[in-house]
From Swiss-Prot:
Reaction catalysis annotation: D-ribose 5-phosphate + ATP = 5-phospho-alpha-D-ribose 1-diphosphate + AMP + H(+)
Residues involved in ATP binding: 34-36, 91-92
Residues where Mg(2+) 2 binds: 161
Record-level Gene Ontology MF annotations: ATP binding; kinase activity; magnesium ion binding; ribose phosphate diphosphokinase activity
Annotated active site: 184
The keyword Metal-binding is annotated on this UniProt entry: yes
InterPro entries: Pribosyltran_N (IPR029099), PRibTrfase_dom (IPR000836), PRTase-like (IPR029057), Rib-P_diPkinase (IPR005946), Rib-P_diPkinase_arc (IPR037514)
PANTHER family named among the record's database cross-references: RIBOSE-PHOSPHATE DIPHOSPHOKINASE FAMILY MEMBER, RIBOSE-PHOSPHATE PYROPHOSPHOKINASE 2
The protein, known as: Ribose-phosphate pyrophosphokinase
Species the sequence originates in: Thermoplasma acidophilum (strain ATCC 25905 / DSM 1728 / JCM 9062 / NBRC 15155 / AMRC-C165)
Length: 286
C-alpha cells in the first residue's frame, strides 16, 4: 500500500501514512513557463493499492488530481483510490437554471473513470455520490469533533440553522450537552431574520457547529445573537473551513475561538480527521 499526498492535503496524508506505517509518496511538480502543471511520480507503485489524498476544491487542485490519476495508472497498480477530504463543486449538484452544468456530476464522472473508488468527508449533498460508477463513500468527521471537545467546558451545542440540527444533536448527545438551532425566517427576497430560542444563556459557554465556513456571514450573525443573549464563551467549529475573503475576522468579532478540521489546511485546522481516513483505508486494505 502507498499513500500519495497532493499539495492541498500533504500534511493530512503524512499523518495517515505514519499511522498506517505506509510509505508516503509526494509528486514531483513544477509549472511550465506558460503556467501549465507538470506532474511526475518517481516511485515503485507496481502491484500496490494506491490511495491519493488531495482536495478538489480549486481548479488547480482538480487538474493536479486528474494528472496524478493518469500518471499513477501507468504503473501496474492493484487499485487507485481517491480520498478528497473536501470535495469541491458539490454545491452545484443539480441544475438550478437552464443552461447551467451539473458541475459535481462532470467531475465525479471524470474521477470515477480513472479510479477504483472515491471517498470524501461530509460531502455537501449526497446526490453527488450517485454520479459515480465506482464506489463513492462519504466519511464523517463527527467523531473527530467529539474527541476534540470531550474535555472542553461547554453548556450548549448550537446549529446556525435547522439544516445542521441532526449533526449538532449527534455531537451534543455524545458530549452529554444540550442543543438547539437558530431559526431563520425570510422577511423578503433580501432580508433573513435570525432568532435564537428563548433560552437563558447568561454566563453559558456555547459551541456553534456547522458543516462549512465559507463567507462566514451566518456564523458571524449567530455569534452576535448568542453574545447578545449573554453567552460568556463562544466556540465556533466546522468540518470544512474555507474562510473566503478572510471571513474569520468578522467571526472573531464575537466568537472567542475557531477550530475546524484539517480537511482544508489552514491556521484554524487543529481538529484532525486522520483517524477517520485511516480507519477507512484499513477497512479497504484488510
Amino acid at each position: 500500500m502507498k499513500i500519495i499526498g497532493l499539495q492541498s492535503s500533504s500534511s493530512l496524508a503524512r499523518k495517515v501514512a505514519e499511522q498506517l506505517h505506509s510509505e508516503l509518496v509526494l509528486p514531483e511538480e513544477r509549472r511550465f513557463p506558460d503556467g501549465e502543471l507538470y506532474v511526475r511520480y518517481d516511485a515503485d507503485l507496481n502491484g500496490e493499492d494506491v490511495f491519493i489524498i488531495g482536495n478538489t476544491h480549486t481548479d488547480a487542485e482538480i487538474i493536479e488530481m486528474i494528472l496524478s490519476l493518469s500518471a499513477v495508472r501507468d504503473y501496474q497498480v492493484k487499485s487507485v483510490n481517491i480520498i478528497a477530504p473536501y470535495y469541491g463543486y458539490a454545491r452545484q449538484h443539480q441544475r438550478y437554471r437552464r443552461g447551467e452544468p451539473i458541475s459535481s456530476q462532470i467531475f465525479t464522472e471524470i474521477f470515477a473513470s480513472y479510479s477504483t473508488s472515491i471517498a470524501t468527508v461530509d460531502i455537501h449533498d449526497e446526490q453527488t455520490l450517485s454520479y459515480s460508477k465506482v464506489r463513492f463513500t462519504d466519511l464523517h468527521a463527527d467523531r473527530s469533533i467529539i474527541d476534540f471537545y470531550r474535555h472542553v467546558d461547554i453548556d450548549y451545542v448550537v446549529s446556525p440553522d435547522d439544516g445542521g440540527l441532526q449533526r449538532v444533536k449527534h455531537v451534543a448527545e455524545a458530549l452529554g450537552k444540550k442543543y438547539f438551532y437558530i431559526e431563520k425566517k425570510r422577511i423578503d427576497d433580501r432580508t433573513v431574520e435570525m432568532k435564537a430560542p428563548d433560552i437563558d444563556l447568561n454566563g453559558k459557554k456555547v459551541l456553534i457547529l456547522d458543516d462549512i465556513i465559507s463567507t462566514g456571514g451566518t456564523i458571524a450573525k449567530s455569534s452576535s445573537i448568542l453574545r447578545q443573549k449573554g453567552a460568556s464563551k463562544i466556540y465556533v467549529s466546522a468540518i470544512h473551513g474555507l474562510f473566503v475573503n478572510s471571513s474569520e475576522s468578522k467571526i472573531l468579532e464575537n466568537a472567542d475561538e475557531i477550530h475546524v478540521t484539517d480537511t482544508v489546511a489552514g491556521k484554524f485546522s487543529d481538529i484532525s480527521v486522520y483517524q477517520v481516513v485511516c480507519d477507512y483505508i484499513a477497512g479497504k486494505h484488510a
